């Protein structure tokens, strides 16, 4: 190791191109990788003396060749390689040195091959001098005494194919060599050029012994080279895998060396994976991987083993360890398949195909577990090679015929042809230049042609005018003179010379001629062309020169420059008309303006035109001067300002005049930011930002930034860098930088998006003051103010170095050399905790100032400071001291925004003046300019903006109450006049907003409260002498629960609500509450039926506070003077009002009435058979008065309400006691029902309460009885008193009703509950109103005409007065029929062919309908001509297969085979399939013309009927899917009476349809309630009708023997699948065992069901057995006797 001597293998690899050429000449193909593998790893194992570094010794080559060419056990894949080696040795190329041509490079141990018996030529002197030991630090250990070399090698070697002598040394020592040079006379072998860890140090001590080995470690240079020259194992495992595989066979590493290689070349994770895979590949005794731990540890130890490498066993174990380690390397190198990485490998524009293939195969090896050189992977590699090649090569390869037969070499060869035939860059440029010139010539020719046509038209028109005006006398056309020759194309008409025209003739005199299309005036430009007005505009980033054409209506482009829209325009030109397209919107940039415009695309136009449309949009002006026409337009930039609506008032604010005296600037020069620069708080430690637990770095890529924006924020970034606020860094955190354009200027400011950082930083409690009550601590006596605004406040606080990497962002400035990340050294803006951190730091710094200056009041809101003092002197002194303190602390104040020692200042959006706060005119102007909203979001924005001013608006909540419902997105937005009035009233109230006094915390407060329409309104006041000054106007809407309370309780809720808001202004001072109710008595003795204990406790904690006192109602309550909608309530006593408003009925009792019957109600709900069953019942103690089951899923509470409601209805006009064991129903009737009704049946969350409909029904039914008492009784009692017994019976009746199918009310004496007006005179007779309602319901289901509907009603058993007029009225008022029915016209009655019985004669037709569900577009209609029965089937297609399928699957099984089928000549009916089916079935298929009434009138009329019915149903239901409505249309068609008064149903089935039976679906009922109730009644009727037929099935069966078979019987067993001509039964079989349902027989393993058996017929036996008694008691004698008769 470390020498530079070349070896045969390295020589061939260095000159591989020559080697491959020689192989090509030999008609073989070789690969570089296999060449190296065979030479260094494979052939040295043959035992013929082949060294790993190769040799040109012919004897060794021939020995390897014999093994390779063996018939059995040979290596055909190695044949090309050994043949090339032989050719190189026999005909050496020039780069083979002379010594290598005859040298035998082999070790003494490796010369035992077939060539060992041949005398070798004496070695020549070495080319290089002998080298001493290369280890620089220490000498190698002393060698043992060298033994004399053997005199001669063995005479005879083993024959080819014969195994070498087992006594010969094997293992790693077989190929080791010494590093020291040997003398030329030494016959032991040539010197090796490779340093090995295990090296032979001499001949073996014994003739057949092992060569002693000595350990030499790897050099650091080799390890460094291997580490640096190979990619990492994770990136490319093939590199290190090949390296270690070669090292294992060439360098003889020991166990320690292997560990050293693993430690240096691999990472910890890679090393563990390799060792794990290696231990999985340890082979057992059977040659397969073993799982035994002892064998694994023995073959592949993880700890250093005690192996002796000078013994055969040690060398064998080392060899096994190396092989296992290589197997582990290969196993760990397997990667999951990632074909996406393979598809990313594309051929470069100038990349040769062979290089691209090599890269592609390398990608396969790296990203897939496949070997691309394997035969099975060639197809995939070939497809990838074709698909990922360059476009021209890919196009060529895809066109090859028989592509599947091409190998990779063939594809590369074809690709090389295309690659080498490519045109060069110069050729491509030349070709493109010629094509451009050709296009230019064609365009010029077209333009010349068009101009020629135009001039010809103009000249001809002028000539015609001349002929009409000046040549009237001579209208004949002039002919040329006789003999005058015609002129050539380039001949002059004046001098007859060629090469010029007459106007350019030099011999012609300069005579001024009249010019065509020009004016004759003095001083004109003559024949020179006028300057054309042209402008250059940037369209989609491309500058284009336009010709200004005011005569053109539209602007024109010659090329679309992008997508073309669908719009087209016909253009009339001189050569005719043509259609041209329009472009989509294109972006134009004109100066600082940007507009979008659509252009007309006319490729034939000579130049782009700027028409009147774009000139108007640009407001262009065209000026004509001596220099030529000039086009100008308004170039003022359009600015867009985006801001929040609540900040819009700042646009209307007048700029605060700078009233700073220059003396202030001179006295404190270090505090003003304009002079002193950026500040730095010198007493605040650096801020440390704490992360959340588990937070990991996040890196958000920088968003793309325009050049303009980058240039705009560059000065700011550079300024921060110069000030040290920004510093370069390298951080795993990164957040994007956003350039924000400042309104009104082109300046940008950098804003960092710190949202991801804010998510990962711990939250701290915000201590920033609330601006709502900040001014409450300002005494009204302080009327002199100073306002200071700190400049760059957050940047005054330093950021701890450990926290700075969190706020890194990416910034590139090539001009300044800044590329990478920057971060903040100060507290950044946009960080969520910055306001709190700065507010706390500034508050701590200013604490000494507050303590030393009690004469002034200092208010701080983050970086806004307010100094208030009672006098100017105090204010000035306090302001000076504050400025001095701020300068000392390191803060900076903005001189532009400072307001010093003034009586009127603006602070936090308020105007402070004379101890009061006012709304600024800017805020009022903002609200006044808001237009009426059109969306819920705009309503919320208006209420939010106006809500900021609600302290100045009396009763703001009342004014805004109509607008609150419009803020919800879930309801439709409808702006009505009521909303507009509320909108205007809020604006008007804002204009008259008064001044509010600042709260004086030294005085008590008075709160006047009033409640109107669910809104709490109040005024917070303080006394000033004899007057009360308002501090704030308060108003708030009550929650839905409190809104439903009585007036007195709503007043309590209003006081509690407003008192909480007033506490924000009073800061816990004493408050006196004045209202128009005796609130204190209500709060101290609250009612127990209106509010929960939690709510009452909350109210008591607020109102029964020692600082809250209640005063008697005042004569004049300022709160009641607020605008109200009704008069004030009269004077009352709250306790009486609450008692009156508690119940729903004053005489409702909760104790039984004496001498009154008692009913017991109960509801039951339970789960049976996985379903929740429910029922309700009423009993009177002896019998059931009413019982019914309820819909599935009904709760027990709902069932109780239903039972109680039904009892109240049945007791209408009576005196009754009703008992219920439900607390829910009892409380609803007595207490909660009234409360629910008052607050709109809403919960505290504003949602509908449960069982809303049942509660409303109960509240209405309570008033029906004459006198009623609803009593609560305990449930499930075991006593014998009447109440307990009645309750138990009611409970049992409810449970039975729940299990039954009865779902309708069942009354004992219904006649007692019917009013006299409702008593029917005859059974079945209806009142006119009920009759009309019945007809309407029937018409809604059928939509029949008046005649058919009248026939249908007459078939019922109902008697309806004025039936005909009612039918005509109902049908004439039907909107769906009016919109669908056609106008009837008189026609003569025709005749049609009909069948003589049902199912004989059918007519069939297709009709097209609009697309419906599942893609159905057609309707296949069959109609029986005899009965009129119709069948209709939705279909997707109109084909013969569909017709045949419906005939076979629908018509034949149900109606039989028809004799005649009639249809038109449609393709589906005349097809061979349809006619063939008719022939096979014997159907006479009659074809006729379409729409012929005599032949197909019945089916055509039915098509119309079905379509009309579907249309009516769709109009009524609003549904669009006609497929779902088709069954209802068929119901109408099948139950419509015909001309004989019979419906198709009656003709076909011989009876009326179920819907016409009395009491059916349409039958009237005393309680004619909703549709669901009617359908349930119909279900009961149907169940009653069919019960008699099916009840026999449900009777319990008789106890009988299930089958007659007994043990010992002979039975026959049925075959499951009898074959052709095979009996159905098999057997007989003997019965062995029986069960009630199955039988076990002899000969069949499985049990046989009794239904598959029958008794076998009796037969005469041919033999019998007899039992005879024997003498021995334990013996029996059985005798067989032949039956002679059976023979």
UniProtKB/Swiss-Prot annotation:
Lipid linkage positions (N-myristoyl glycine): 2
Reaction equations catalysed: DNA(n) + a 2'-deoxyribonucleoside 5'-triphosphate = DNA(n+1) + diphosphate; Endonucleolytic cleavage to 5'-phosphomonoester
UniProt site positions, description: Cleavage: 128-129, 196-197, 455-456, 517-518, 641-642, 1310-1311
Domain of life: Viruses
Domain (RNase H type-1): residue spans on this chain: 1153-1299
Location of the region described as Disordered in the Swiss-Prot/TrEMBL record: 106-197, 420-490
Compositional bias (Pro residues): 139-157
Gene Ontology MF, one: DNA binding
Binding residues for Mg(2+) 1: 789, 863-864
Coiled coil (UniProt feature): 408-455
Compositionally biased spans, kind Basic and acidic residues: 420-451, 479-490
Active site: 549 (protease)
Cofactor: Mg(2+)
Name under which the protein is recorded: Gag-Pol polyprotein
């Amino acid at each position: 190791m470390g020498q530079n001597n070349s070896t045969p293998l390295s020589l061939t690899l260095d000159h591989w191109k020559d080697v491959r050429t020689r192989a090509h000449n030999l008609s073989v193909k070789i690969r570089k990788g296999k060449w190296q593998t065979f030479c260094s790893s494979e052939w040295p194992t043959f035992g013929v003396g082949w060294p790993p570094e190769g040799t040109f010794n012919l004897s060794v080559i021939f020995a390897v060749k014999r093994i390779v060419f063996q018939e059995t056990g040979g290596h055909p894949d190695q044949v090309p390689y050994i043949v090339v080696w032989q050719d190189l040795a026999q005909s050496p190329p020039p780069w083979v040195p002379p010594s290598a041509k005859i040298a035998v490079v082999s070790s003494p141990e490796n010369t035992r091959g077939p060539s060992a018996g041949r005398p070798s030529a004496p070695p020549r002197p070495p080319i290089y001098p002998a080298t001493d030991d290369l280890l620089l630090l220490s000498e190698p250990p002393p060698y043992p005494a060298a033994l004399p070399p053997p005199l001669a090698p063995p005479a005879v070697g083993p024959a080819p194919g014969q195994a070498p002598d087992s006594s010969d040394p094997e293992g790693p020592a077989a190929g080791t060599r010494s590093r020291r040079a040997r003398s030329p006379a030494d016959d032991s072998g040539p010197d090796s050029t490779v340093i090995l860890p295990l090296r032979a140090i001499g001949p073996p001590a014994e003739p057949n012994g092992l060569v002693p080995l000595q350990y030499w470690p790897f050099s650091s240079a080799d390890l460094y080279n291997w580490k640096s020259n190979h990619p990492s194992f994770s990136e490319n495992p093939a590199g290190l895998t090949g390296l270690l595989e070669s090292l294992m066979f060439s360098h003889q590493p020991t166990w320690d060396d292997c560990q050293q290689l693993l430690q240096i070349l691999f990472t910890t994770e890679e090393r563990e994976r390799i060792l794990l895979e290696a231990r999985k590949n340890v082979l057992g005794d059977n040659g397969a991987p073993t799982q035994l731990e002892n064998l694994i540890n023995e073959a592949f130890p993880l700890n250093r083993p005690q192996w002796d490498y000078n013994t055969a066993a040690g060398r064998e174990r080392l060899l096994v360890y190396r092989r296992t380690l290589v197997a582990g390397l290969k196993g760990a190198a397997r990667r999951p398949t990632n074909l996406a990485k393979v598809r990313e490998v594309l051929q470069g524009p100038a990349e040769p195909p062979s290089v691209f293939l090599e890269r592609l195969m390398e990608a396969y090896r790296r990203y897939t577990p496949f070997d691309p050189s394997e035969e099975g992977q060639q197809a995939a590699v070939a497809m990838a090679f074709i698909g990922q090649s360059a476009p021209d090569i890919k196009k060529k390869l895809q066109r090859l015929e028989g592509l599947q037969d091409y190998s990779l070499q063939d594809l590369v060869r074809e690709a090389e042809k295309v690659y080498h035939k490519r045109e060069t860059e110069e050729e491509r440029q030349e070709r493109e230049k010629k094509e451009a010139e050709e296009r230019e010539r064609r365009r010029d020719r077209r333009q010349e042609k068009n101009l020629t046509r135009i001039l010809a038209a103009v000249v001809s028109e002028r000539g015609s005018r001349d002929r009409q005006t000046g040549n009237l006398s001579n209208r004949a056309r002039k002919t040329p003179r006789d003999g005058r020759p015609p002129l050539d194309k380039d001949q002059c008409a004046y001098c007859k010379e060629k090469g010029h025209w007459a106007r350019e003739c030099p011999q012609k005199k300069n005579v001024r001629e009249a010019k065509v299309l020009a004016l004759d005036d003095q001083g004109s430009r003559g024949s020179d062309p006028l300057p054309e007005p042209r402008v250059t505009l940037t369209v989609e980033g491309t500058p284009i020169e336009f010709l200004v054409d005011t005569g053109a209506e539209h602007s024109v482009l010659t090329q679309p420059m992008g997508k073309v829209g669908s719009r087209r325009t016909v253009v009339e030109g001189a050569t005719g008309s043509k259609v041209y397209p329009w472009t989509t919107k294109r972006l134009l940039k004109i100066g600082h303006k940007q507009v979008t415009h659509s252009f007309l695309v006319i490729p034939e136009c000579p130049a782009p035109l700027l028409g009147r449309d774009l000139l108007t949009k640009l407001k262009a002006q065209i000026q004509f001067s001596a220099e030529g026409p000039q086009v100008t337009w308004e170039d003022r930039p359009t600015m867009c300002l985006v801001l929040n609506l609540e900040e819009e008032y700042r646009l209307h604010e007048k700029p605060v005049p700078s009233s700073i005296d220059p003396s202030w600037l001179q006295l404190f020069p270090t505090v003003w930011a304009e002079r002193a620069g950026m500040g730095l708080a010198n007493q605040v430690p650096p801020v440390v930002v704490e992360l959340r637990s588990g937070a990991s770095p996040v890196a958000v890529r920088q968003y793309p930034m325009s050049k303009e924006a980058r240039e705009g924020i560059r000065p700011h970034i550079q300024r921060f860098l110069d000030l040290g606020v920004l510093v370069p860094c390298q951080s795993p955190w990164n957040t994007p930088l956003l350039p924000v354009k400042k309104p009104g200027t082109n300046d940008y400011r950098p804003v960092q998006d710190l949202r991801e950082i804010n998510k990962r930083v711990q939250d701290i409690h915000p201590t920033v003051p609330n601006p709502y009550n900040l001014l409450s601590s300002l005494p009204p006596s302080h009327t002199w103010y100073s306002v200071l605004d700190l400049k760059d406040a957050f940047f005054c606080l330093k950021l701890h170095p450990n926290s700075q990497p969190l706020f890194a962002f990416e910034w590139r400035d090539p001009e300044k050399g800044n590329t990478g990340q920057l971060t903040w050294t100060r507290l950044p803006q946009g960080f969520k905790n910055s306001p709190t951190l700065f507010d706390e730091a500034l508050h701590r710094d200013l604490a000494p100032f507050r303590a030393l200056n009690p004469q002034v009041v200092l208010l701080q809101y983050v970086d806004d400071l307010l100094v208030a003092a009672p006098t100017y002197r105090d204010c000035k002194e306090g302001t000076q001291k504050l400025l001095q303190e701020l300068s000392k602390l390191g803060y900076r104040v903005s001189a532009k925004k400072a307001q010093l020692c003034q009586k009127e200042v603006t602070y936090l959006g308020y105007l402070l003046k004379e101890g009061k706060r006012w709304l600024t005119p800017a805020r009022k102007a903002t609200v006044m300019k808001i237009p009426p909203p059109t969306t819920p979001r705009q309503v919320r924005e208006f209420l939010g903006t106006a809500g900021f001013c609600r302290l100045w608006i009396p009763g703001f909540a009342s004014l805004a109450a109509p607008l609150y419902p419009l803020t919800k997105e879930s309801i439709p937005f409808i702006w009505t006049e009521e909303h507009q009035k509320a909108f205007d009233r809020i604006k008007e109230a804002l204009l008259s907003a008064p001044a509010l006094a600042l709260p004086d915390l030294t005085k008590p407060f008075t709160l006047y409260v009033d409640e109107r329409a669910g809104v709490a309104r109040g005024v917070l006041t303080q006394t000033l002498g004899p007057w009360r000054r308002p501090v704030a106007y308060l108003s708030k809407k009550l929650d839905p629960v409190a809104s439903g309370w009585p007036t007195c309780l709503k007043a309590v809720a209003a006081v509690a609500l407003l008192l909480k808001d007033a506490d924000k202004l009073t800061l816990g001072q004493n408050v006196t509450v004045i209202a128009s109710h005796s609130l204190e008595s209500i709060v101290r003795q609250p009612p127990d039926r209106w509010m929960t204990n939690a709510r009452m406790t909350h109210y008591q904690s607020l109102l029964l506070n020692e600082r809250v006192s209640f005063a008697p109602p005042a004569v004049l309550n300022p709160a009641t003077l607020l605008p109200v909608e009704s008069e004030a309530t009269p004077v009352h006593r709250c306790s009486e009002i609450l008692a009156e408003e508690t119940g729903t009925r004053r005489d409702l009792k909760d104790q039984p009435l004496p001498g009154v019957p008692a009913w017991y109600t109960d509801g039951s709900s339970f789960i049976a058979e996985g379903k929740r069953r429910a029922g309700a019942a009423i009993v009177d103690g002896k019998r059931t008065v009413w019982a019914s089951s309820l819909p599935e899923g009904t709760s027990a509470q709902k069932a109780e309400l239903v039972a109680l409601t039904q009892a109240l209805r049945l007791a209408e006009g009576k005196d009754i006691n009703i008992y219920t064991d439900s607390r829910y129903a009892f409380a609803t009737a007595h207490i909660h029902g009234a409360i629910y009704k008052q607050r709109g049946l809403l919960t505290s969350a504003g949602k509908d309460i449960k069982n809303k409909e049942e509660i409303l029904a109960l509240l209405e039914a309570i008033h029906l009885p004459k006198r009623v008492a609803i009593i609560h009784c305990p449930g499930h009692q075991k006593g014998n008193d009447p109440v307990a017994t009645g309750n138990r019976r009611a409970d049992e009746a409810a449970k039975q009703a729940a299990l039954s199918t009865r779902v309708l009310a069942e009354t004992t004496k219904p006649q007692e509950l019917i009013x006299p007006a409702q008593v029917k005179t005859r059974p079945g007779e209806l009142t006119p109103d009920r009759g009309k309602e019945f007809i309407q319901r029937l018409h809604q289901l059928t939509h029949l005409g008046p005649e058919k509907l009248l026939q249908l009603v007459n078939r019922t058993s109902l008697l309806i007065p004025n039936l005909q007029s009612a039918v005509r009225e109902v049908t004439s008022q039907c909107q769906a029929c009016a919109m669908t029915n056609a106008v009837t016209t008189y026609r003569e009655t025709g005749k049609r062919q009909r069948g003589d019985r049902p199912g004989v004669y059918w007519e069939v037709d297709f009709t097209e309908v609009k697309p419906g569900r599942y893609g159905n577009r057609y309707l296949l209609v069959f109609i029986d001509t005899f009965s009129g029965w119709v069948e209709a089937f939705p279909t997707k297609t109109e084909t013969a297969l569909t017709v045949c399928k419906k005939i076979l699957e629908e018509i034949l099984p149900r109606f039989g085979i028809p004799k005649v089928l009639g249809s038109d000549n449609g393709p589906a009916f005349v097809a061979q399939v349809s006619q063939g089916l008719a022939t096979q079935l014997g159907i006479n298929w009659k074809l006729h013309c379409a729409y012929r009434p005599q032949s197909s009138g019945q089916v055509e009329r039915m098509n119309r009927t079905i379509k009309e019915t579907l249309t009516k149903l769709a109009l009524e239901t609003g549904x669009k899917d006609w497929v779902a409505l088709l069954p209802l249309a068929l119901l109408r068609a099948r139950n419509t009476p015909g001309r004989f008064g019979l419906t198709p149903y009656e003709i076909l089935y011989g009876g009326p349809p179920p819907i016409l039976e009395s009491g059916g679906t349409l039958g009237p009922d005393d309680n004619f309630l909703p549709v669901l109730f009617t359908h349930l009644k119909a279900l009961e009727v149907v169940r009653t009708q069919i019960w008699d037929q099916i009840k026999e099935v449900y009777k319990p069966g008789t106890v009988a023997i299930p089958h007659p078979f007994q043990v010992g019987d002979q039975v026959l067993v049925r075959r499951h699948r009898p074959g052709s001509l095979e009996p159905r039964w098999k057997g007989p079989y003997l019965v062995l065992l029986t069960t009630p349902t199955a039988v076990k027989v002899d000969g069949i393993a499985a049990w046989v069901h009794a239904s598959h058996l029958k008794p076998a017929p009796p037969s005469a036996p041919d033999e019998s057995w007899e039992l005879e008694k024997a003498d021995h008691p334990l013996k029996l004698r059985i005798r067989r006797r032949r039956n002679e008769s059976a023979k």
